[in-house]
Amino acid sequence: MTTLELGRLSDRHPPFKYSALTRVWFSDTDAQGVVYYGRYLPYFDHARVEYHRHLDMPTVSRSGREFVMRASTVEYHAPARFDDLLEIFVRVARIGRSSVTYEGAAYRVEDDALMVTASQTLVLVDMEERASVPIPDWWRDKLRAFERGDLEE
């Protein structure tokens, strides 16, 4: 089944190779008229899902395993406002035995200004046992092929 991909390959901000576009909606803003700090996490989730879609890597959940968030850090560089078009870059920076660390960067498209950077570590967990499990080789192989020499293991 083919699904519409909402991201794209990009070489505009190495080492990132993939990005997804999103627009700031009014509901994303706070009383100061800028993007509420917590709204950036869904933007990065969106880009990560599209990254996986591009690599034909649906979730691992078919096997009763899921990636769960272990750590998330966000740094705010400049405010985004209602109706700004943002390009959210994402990459896998590191893959461990059972964890994957993603890096992200959000740029305003109009002037290519850096808005936010993020690092998120997810752990593959057996949902029944509630314990971490090794990341499958097929998953690692796809990431290695896409990220090439930019992936830490």
Region spans (language model):
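Catalytic strand-loop segment that frames the active site of acyl-thioester-processing enzymes
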Residues: 2-57
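Residue-level recognition of specific faces of alpha-helices
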Residues: 40-43, 68, 121
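HotDog/MaoC-like acyl-thioester-processing domains
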Residues: 2-20, 76-82, 93-153
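A broad, structural micro-motif
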Residues: 35, 67-69, 115
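Helix-adjacent hinge/juxtasegments
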Residues: 63-95
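Short beta-edge strand/loop motif at the mouth of beta-sheet-based domains
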Residues: 54-55, 60-66
